[in-house]
């Protein structure tokens, strides 16, 4: 059962709440969140579409077979540009399983257009063999079809 306490301006969920979006203004407290993830027995290669309306975390469990480009979008029919407003940011992660020959994320796109991320330390030039590469991206919308991306690569062996 959900209730709204007018005096405290609080929306209290005692069991569950289902909705398309929750817009909260001001400071919020969360005990915990569960992010939607997609786990796929797919090998990273070519251009990988990361659908932000589908997941916050994408995990490819088959060994990467080539360097890849990640393309961030809303989904196959909705642009990321259309679901974000200027001043918003989106944080996502892409996990890639590496075999004995490692590969890496060599390019980033948003809605099919190339962007130049600001990488922590430096852009990756390799992966790590027999590991899981974790790529984190924070995407800032700075204007119409204008984005700044900061990114990092970590390897878990």
What is each PLM-predicted segment?
Residues 1-54:
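Intrinsic low-complexity, repeat-rich intrinsically disordered segments enriched
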Residues 55-60:
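Short carbohydrate-recognition loop motifs
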Residues 63-157:
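Acidic, glycine/polar-enriched metal-coordinating patches/loops
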